[in-house]
Regions:
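ABC ATP-binding cassette signature C-motif
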Residues: 1-257, 311-635
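A short, polar/charged loop/turn motif at coil->beta-strand junctions and beta-hairpin connectors
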Residues: 264, 299-303, 314-316
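Intracellular alpha-helical coupling/juxtamembrane segments of multi-pass membrane proteins
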Residues: 244-277, 281-287, 291-298
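Long, charged, glycine-rich C-terminal linkers/tails
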Residues: 301-309, 437
């Protein structure tokens, strides 16, 4: 028997139902990804499965005594108290007893008065009476699993840690089905990696919503697509789903075209003259009416957003130049002796944990903050369009239309006037939705509105700080295409690994203590180079001391002059170094070309491997030359 079975589900809040005779079956020990466009009803379906929202029609059957728990889409806001209290509230009926026990236990440690000891005894008696010691142990186990300190104040936690606390609250009830709504939102890449590992050890079923394609690929054992009120199951991985979904849409398009052709023929027949009416078949008339009704009820596939950047005139060749830049806040080093050059057309991602200084570096580059030391030079003719991750630019009380156009009826798009409603439809805002206050929008809709505003501004430098949060996959892919075709310079911050892979030619990785590594390629290319670089440094550190000692001992034992073969090798090394430098420079020029990463993945990986080998060969040749020179001078 399924853990959850939903039959003939119907739910509507407007003209178009969110669920239209939908069916769903959830089995034990599977990880189901629920996909669909923004506004399709995925979060509402999660609430239904968690018994928070009822159906207009249909029924849901749960396995007896099934425990379901849900992690909400946004991390908790404006919460106070300890982590322990917050997590304990996941067991709602017994939470007060457990919270009081935790509180009085700590109080007794600092003030073991008779009053406090008597209170502790009473609370312990209540725990005994209700059999709550097992729940106390479970809370402590969950806190330990998540690396959470019981006495940490919620108000002092970052978004990522609040997310962990919320996950602990969802887990503590011992659910057999765990519902996760956008679990990677507000998490950095390291936290996402941790979450993937943790969830794979979960003993139960996970149903999750995510637009992070890497996360879906790593987690999902089955895809359920919510499309126009129907739930369609696709067994297997995410890439298989994409292929099958595309084929299903192609077949649907052909079937609709054939249906429309037949309907048009019947409409011609019914409108023919007296001769046709004499032989009119009443059954055929009834069939035509049924076809008309079916056509009127058809829900078309939701269109894709149409984004276009208003590009300004070209900037100067050098966009930014930084030399030995340092910046600290309250004693914490965020940028340490950083030097870099950004040229026109570069597309660079800033990668690192939350709070490491990515947004700070962008503000330093734009002159919004002053560096402690070092030099930052901004290029000429820069026209900046800045996408803010905190969404502070939108007025929640004004409508979508007014937030975009300040009460005007037209906006300028590529130098031509365009009606606001028409422009907003390119970003999937129906005219009715354009009249809605911003406070009523979903996260994805707010993001689309910010992008609509951003792309009206002429620019040759795009600064995108977390642009992918809450965007559905189709809009994400369109944004990727837009960035790929953008002729200006792009600097972006994102924790979406595939988005970074698909958009940038260089990554700046924050490696701790203000150090920033610069690597060519997308996210996975950069991580590979970073790992290789660290391994080489460790190998060099290990080899430096040992050969030095060995060489010193050899020199003491054998002060004789160099052999003929070593002399010949030393004489040939300068030419060898020139050849290696030339080969390395040629590879660097090839990789730096803007079109390099548009070529096949296997080819780019081969060239990057050759680049790494060339760097290593040059370094080894220099070390060999220095060693032979030291032998020569000591001979």
């Amino acid at each position: 028997m399924s853990l959850i079975s939903m039959h003939g589900a119907w739910l509507s809040f407007s003209d178009l139902p969110l669920l239209d005779n939908a069916e769903l079956h959830i089995e034990d020990n599977e990880r189901v990804c629920l996909v669909g466009r923004n506004g399709a009803g995925k979060s509402t379906l999660m609430k239904i499965l968690n018994r928070e929202q009822g159906l207009d029609d249909g029924r849901i059957v749960y396995e007896q005594d099934l425990i379901v728990s849900r992690l909400q889409q946004d991390p908790p806001r404006n919460v106070t108290g300890s982590v322990y209290d917050f997590v304990a509230e996941g067991i709602s009926e017994q939470a007060e007893y457990l919270k009081r026990y935790h509180e009085i236990s700590h109080l007794v440690m600092t003030d073991p008065s008779d009053k406090n000891l008597n209170e502790l005894a009473k609370v312990q008696e209540m725990l005994d009476h209700h059999g709550l010691w097992q729940l106390e142990n479970r809370i402590n186990e969950v806190l330990a699993q998540l690396g959470l300190e019981a006495d940490m104040e919620l108000s002092a936690l970052s978004g990522g840690w609040l997310r962990k606390a919320a996950l602990g609250r969802a887990l503590v009830s011992g659910p057999k089905v765990l519902l996760l709504d956008e679990p990677t939102n507000h998490l950095d890449i390291e936290a996402i990696d941790w979450l993937e590992g943790f969830l794979k050890t979960f003993n139960g079923t996970i149903i999750f919503i995510s637009h992070d394609r890497s996360f879906i690929r790593n987690m999902a054992t089955r895809i359920v697509d919510l499309d126009r009120g129907k739930l369609v199951t696709y067994p297997g991985d995410y890439d298989t789903y994409l292929l099958e979904k595309e084929e299903n849409l192609r077949v649907e398009e052909l079937q609709n075209a054939e249906f429309d052709r037949k309907l048009a023929q019947e409409e011609v027949w019914i409108r023919q003259g007296i001769k046709a009416r004499r032989t009119r078949n009443e059954g055929r008339v009834r069939a035509l009416k049924a076809m008309r009704r079916e056509r009127s009820e058809r829900r078309e596939v939701m269109g894709s957003a149409k984004m276009q950047v208003e590009e300004a005139s070209r900037s100067g060749k050098i966009v930014f130049e930084m030399e030995n830049v340092n910046y600290s806040v309250d004693g914490k080093v965020l940028v340490n002796d950083f030097s870099a050059r950004v040229q026109r057309g570069d597309k660079i991602a800033l990668i690192g944990p939350n709070g490491c200084g990515k947004t700070t570096l962008l503000k330093l580059m734009l002159g919004q903050l002053q560096a402690d030391s070092g030099r930052i030079h901004c290029g000429t003719k820069l026209e900046v369009a800045y996408f803010d991750q905190h969404r502070a630019e939108l007025d929640p009380d004004r409508t979508v239309m007014d937030n975009l156009a300040e009460g005007k009826q037209e906006v300028m798009v590529n130098g031509k006037p365009r009606h606001v409603l028409g422009y907003l439809q390119d970003f999937l805002f129906h005219p009715k939705r354009a009249m809605t206050p911003v406070r009523a929008l979903s996260g994805g809709e707010r993001n689309r509105l910010l992008l609509a505003r951003l792309f009206l501004k002429p620019s040759n430098l795009l600064i995108l700080d977390e642009p992918t949060n809450d965007l559905d996959v189709e809009t994400l892919e369109l944004l990727e295409e837009l960035i790929d075709g953008y002729q200006g310079t792009v600097m972006l911050v994102s924790h979406d690994r595939q988005f970074v892979d698909n958009t940038v030619t260089e990554c700046w990785i924050f490696e701790g203590e203000g150090r920033i590594g610069q690597y060519v390629g997308g996210y996975h290319d950069a991580r590979g180079q970073q790992s290789q670089s660290m391994a080489q440094k460790q190998a060099r550190t290990k080899s430096v001391a040992e050969p030095v000692v060995a060489k010193a001992e050899t020199a003491k034992k054998s002060p004789a002059k160099m052999s003929y073969n070593l002399q010949r090798e030393l004489e040939g090394l300068p030419q060898r170094l020139e050849e290696l430098e030339a080969a390395l420079e040629a590879l660097q020029i090839q990789v730096a070309d803007a079109s390099f990463f548009t070529q096949p993945h296997d080819y780019t990986q081969k060239v990057l491997a050759e680049l790494s080998q060339a760097e290593q060969a040059l370094e080894e040749a220099f070390e060999r030359w220095e060693y032979l020179e030291s032998l020569k001078n000591g001979a």
